[in-house]
């Protein structure tokens, strides 16, 4: 069965430190401890508290995709590291231990994202990325911190993807996935 093969491959190929951090941060911190704290904070503050926070560290992007809003904003909308840190710190006080990042292209800020992962190693971080800024150093840093995962987007096969995102982007993304 294809799903069983996928799960076995995932278990076989995932770095043990990354698997441990995922289990601890999503399984214990977010699902168990976080949920308990969220329920308490909902009563204290008399409002809904989400189980994750979605944030855009930057509006900047290294691509200029046809029809994308990011090119209209340029590189001027950025949360500082201190602002990102404050969001996570306040979120943890409410019981939130899962943070998703979009953009722009969040990996334009990969040094700050890794720094955030190091500082808040009890949290899980996930970035939606075009994949073109994934390099060996980032992969090594992700393996070291263990609490950052990526979703890499494509527009379809090479012709459709490169028509919208630019020539050669499809190949860069496939290389990043290796």
Where are the regions a protein language model picked out?
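N-terminal [4Fe-4S]-dependent radical SAM core
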Residues: 2-54
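A broad, low-specificity signal for short, low-complexity segments enriched in glycine/proline
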Residues: 12-19, 26-29, 61-62, 87, ...
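N-terminal start-of-chain detector that recognizes signal peptides
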Residues: 24-30, 71, 97-99, 121-124
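A generic structural signal for short
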Residues: 42-43, 53, 75-76, 126-127, ...
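Canonical Radical SAM [4Fe-4S] cluster-binding loop centered on the CxxxCxxC motif
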Residues: 46-48, 52-82
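Radical SAM/AdoMet-radical enzyme domain recognition
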Residues: 81-101, 109-178
């Amino acid at each position: 069965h294809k799903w069983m093969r996928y799960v076995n491959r995932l278990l076989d190929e995932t770095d043990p430190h990354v698997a441990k951090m995922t289990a601890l941060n999503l399984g214990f911190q977010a699902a168990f401890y976080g949920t308990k704290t969220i329920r308490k904070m909902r009563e204290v503050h008399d409002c809904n508290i989400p189980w994750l926070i979605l944030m855009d560290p930057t509006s900047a992007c290294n691509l200029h995709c046809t029809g994308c809003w990011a090119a209209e904003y340029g590189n001027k909308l950025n949360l500082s590291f201190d602002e990102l840190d404050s969001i996570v710190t306040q979120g943890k006080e409410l019981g939130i231990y899962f943070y998703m990042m979009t953009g722009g292209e969040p990996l334009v800020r990969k040094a700050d994202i890794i720094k955030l992962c190091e500082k808040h190693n009890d949290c899980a971080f996930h970035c939606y990325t075009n994949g073109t800024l994934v390099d060996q150093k980032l992969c090594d840093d992700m393996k070291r911190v263990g609490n950052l995962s990526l979703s890499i987007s494509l527009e379809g096969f090479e012709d459709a993807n490169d028509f919208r995102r630019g020539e050669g982007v499809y190949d860069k993304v496939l290389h990043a996935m290796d």
